Curated annotation (Swiss-Prot):
It comes from Thiobacillus denitrificans (strain ATCC 25259 / T1). This is LexA repressor. The record marks A82, G83 as: Cleavage. GO terms for molecular function: DNA binding; serine-type endopeptidase activity. GO terms for biological process: DNA repair; DNA replication; negative regulation of DNA-templated transcription; proteolysis; SOS response. Keywords: Autocatalytic cleavage, DNA damage, DNA repair, DNA replication, DNA-binding, Hydrolase, Repressor, SOS response, Transcription, Transcription regulation. It catalyses: Hydrolysis of Ala-|-Gly bond in repressor LexA. It comes from the Bacteria. Belongs to the peptidase S24 family. The lineage of its organism: Bacteria, Pseudomonadati, Pseudomonadota, Betaproteobacteria, Nitrosomonadales. Its EC number is 3.4.21.88. Coiled coil: none annotated. The gene is lexA. InterPro entries: LexA, LexA-like, LexA/Signal_pep-like_sf, LexA_DNA-bd_dom, LexA_repressor, Peptidase_S24_LexA, Peptidase_S24_S26A/B/C, WH-like_DNA-bd_sf. Represses a number of genes involved in the response to DNA damage (SOS response), including recA and lexA. In the presence of single-stranded DNA, RecA interacts with LexA causing an autocatalytic cleavage which disrupts the DNA-binding part of LexA, leading to derepression of the SOS regulon and eventually DNA repair.
Amino acid sequence: MRDLTPRQEEILNLIREWIDTTGSPPTRAEIAQHFGFSSPNAAEQHLKTLAKKGALELVSGASRGIRLPGGGGLAVVGQVAAGSPILAQENIERHVQVDTALFSPRADYLLKVRGQSMKDIGILDGDLLAVHRSAEARAGQVVVARIGDEVTVKRFQKRGHTVQLLPENADFEPIVVDLKRQELVIEGIAVGVIRSGRSL
């Protein structure tokens, strides 16, 4: 890590304290308010400089997308339906210490699974799904997809302007999306599952 200025050290210390106290890093606005910056953009510039110096990593597309090397872990974000879609909650509940090198491509965050629609491939209710942030998916990949304001975990298939989000449980029906009538956004690709607290 390259030498940091006193202000950069202060920002880094604030981020560490915030994670220790609240379980998640501060937003750009919270950093700006703490230091009396004129806008969150000023905080963003400091964060980008800290990232270039290797002091932290920025995760694009998340208001609290700041990761400290060797600390902070992966954010557990909201809950994702693995059955009927539920309203997406972009709330960071906590952080989990995980070696991101275990996943390829690298995991950007964890999403809590609710439901049993993917149980036949080992994605169970209560699991933490490791997700690589991506706006694109290939046929056959397991994706986190958003339809309107709701999210679901399913296997992705596309033919023409029709997308099928396929469950891995015969008790559930596929979700069929006509892209001419409905908006579908790929939020990420599933790259692994973390299960804890269950006896074998």
